[in-house]
Amino acid sequence: MKTTHLWSQEDEEQLIRKLVNNFCDLINRSEEEGLYWTGLKCDLIELAHIVWETGQLTDQQGRLMDFQSIVWHICRVLHVRVPCNPSSVVSSVRARKNVRVGPLRERYLQLIVDAKIQDPMRLEIRRRRR
């Protein structure tokens, strides 16, 4: 049985804005701040791809950041080993069939709409205890 989507275009746009803002904030941080990604690495790479698709992240010279750079920066800050080929990770995630876990975008939208969690990505980031 197929699930019904209970979110609007506005909900999707809100999610994308939140993700872009999170990435802008995070890639400018230092790994010494002790932030750690606790979710799946493939989810983080998929998030990076969603953000890259918006074309809204720029480097210090004002040029659009490429996908590899976004992945490198976010993995550095969140203490995740950078995959050799991030694009293949995205391809693998999108090619999955018959999995119990739905697409990341849908999971995050469900958290926003049903659980009233405004920033689902932040649930998967923890700070190292000092």
At which residue positions do the language-model features occur?
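Generic serine detector
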Residues: 8, 30, 69, 87-92
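Mature extracytoplasmic or organellar-lumen-exposed domains after removal of signal/transit peptides
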Residues: 69-71, 76
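Alpha-helical oligomerization segments
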Residues: 65, 77-130
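Acidic, serine/proline-rich, intrinsically disordered low-complexity segments
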Residues: 1-62, 83, 113-130
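Short runs of predominantly hydrophobic/aromatic residues within well-ordered alpha helices
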Residues: 41-48, 67, 101, 105
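Amphipathic, heptad-repeat alpha-helices with coiled-coil/zipper character that mediate oligomerization
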Residues: 62-65, 69
